[in-house]
Amino acid sequence: MANAPVLLLKEGTQRSSGRDALKNNILAAVTLAEMLKSSLGPRGLDKMLIDSFGDVTITNDGATIVKEMEIQHPAAKLLVEAAKAQDAEVGDGTTSAVVLAGLLLDKADDLLDQNIHPTIIIEGYKKALNKSLEIIDQLATKIDVSNLNSLATRDQLKKIVYTTMSSKFIAGGEEMDKIMNMVIDAVSIVAEPLPEGGYNVPLDLIKIDKKKGGSIEDSMLVHGLVLDKEVVHPGMPRRVEKAKIAVLDAALEVEKPEISAKISITSPEQIKAFLDEEAKYLKDMVDKLASIGANVVICQKGIDDVAQHFLAKKGILAVRRVKRSDIEKLEKALGARIISSIKDATPEDLGYAELVEERRVGNDKMVFIEGAKNPKAVNILLRGSNDMALDEAERSINDALHSLRNVLMKPMIVAGGGAVETELALRLREYARSVGGKEQLAIEKFAEALEEIPMILAETAGMEPIQTLMDLRAKHAKGLINAGVDVMNGKIADDMLALNVLEPVRVKAQVLKSAVEAATAILKIDDLIAAAPLKSGEKKGEKKEGGEEEKSSTPSSLE
């Protein structure tokens, strides 16, 4: 009995444990990071992703790449989760987070080969992370964002946006300049000052619409909102100046009773009386809106044909079936109150805009609501020659918006171009000597992983990576803390801040946190148990004959 096999897992279940499981997971994560490495930085290359429907996406945006890839390996999925966490928290630095996590795991693999326990590596990495965050705060430069409309502040913000967008499809020339100004204007409008300093930037109040046709230069920022709808009736005006706008989430229709009901009609006069009463009900609703001064009606629900007729007779422009999210943005943009009950509506519920106009954009008609007095929501309308260019422009703008939000929430910046990583590596090696023990080796490997970032940037720019790192180390040893890789000119610069290559501290710190969390999560796994695939026709949790639910206890021999 003592030598009998223990039957524990379902037949067909695969299990690997200890060093084998860890090596397998590290290999999967490092492979994913290797795929993204070439997309890092302003000279990063694009990936062409083709989904199962044949749709093509061309991008170098890390968040989009990992989202579109159908990752199967569970360890690689942990890196995908790290990218999603990075994207959700700060909206930028996703490629950096995945690549750094892969580098940390690659270095951890070297330590495992030296028989250093994963727990010691994890502790070393955590100490290195905490020290790195401390050093980043010391290296950071505070910027003045007290007046978002001042030329000096706008100039500083433009430099930050430029660094974020320089790796994207639309980078360069007048197109980029126009997009940068639109993004800064949009953020300046919706930003809300915080009592402790800095700003809260609710990005959900900045709507981005895309319309094929024209070029990126034809894009515009609307101080109000653009609705992808048409005016509902041909007899209505197409243009209303000094618009007083009723924003409704009630239908301009005769409501159906909640319970099923039938009407017994015995004569033609009764039909006429019924229709007349219905028309009167709708006319009263329109008269009420007209009486409070509304000359534009934006409705979340339907507008009856008869109501459309009465609105047209009153010269009121109306739009129906508007999305709830747009209704809420209109409330913020126009200073309106959403009207749920038309009979209780008052003039104070109306919003104001200088102009409401239906225009043709490309092949479609859209309603522009512009010139709100004090808008708290705005709309960026993107134009472009094809869907791919529009999608990449939208991703660029999203990255830029998040970058500005990060720097306004915490107005501190550091030098880009691998300058911070090189300085961190230098100081972490000094710190490692003070820690001692085997954890010292983990901290030194953390420093090595950070130094790979400027090497990757150099490689994407066609520079010699090892020579670049040697030169960078020499400059940082002399005290040039902002020396980094100038990838645009293919050389090393003494001061990346002077070249306007700036990154928000919040993004840089989150990259380190996300990467370390993902790497340590994988290093903690020492057992990998993969259930046998379901047989055809079998469902998860399906009951066997005899009525018992099948569980993963069907025997598999484990010696």
From Swiss-Prot:
Coiled-coil ranges per UniProt: none
Q: Which InterPro entries match?
A: Chaperone_TCP-1, Chaperonin_TCP-1_CS, Cpn60/GroEL/TCP-1, GroEL-like_apical_dom_sf, GROEL-like_equatorial_sf, TCP-1-like_intermed_sf, TCP-1_chaperonin, thermosome_alpha
Q: Which domain of life is it from?
A: Archaea
Annotated segments matching region Disordered:
536-559
User: What NCBIfam families would the database entry show?
Assistant: thermosome_alpha (NF041082), thermosome_arch (TIGR02339), thermosome_beta (NF041083)
- Protein purpose: Molecular chaperone; binds unfolded polypeptides in vitro, and has a weak ATPase activity.
Q: How would you summarize the oligomeric state and partners of this protein?
A: Forms a Heterooligomeric complex of two stacked nine-membered rings; one of alpha and the other of beta subunits.
What is this protein identified as?
Thermosome subunit alpha
Instruction: Record the organism.
Output: Sulfurisphaera tokodaii (strain DSM 16993 / JCM 10545 / NBRC 100140 / 7) (Sulfolobus tokodaii)
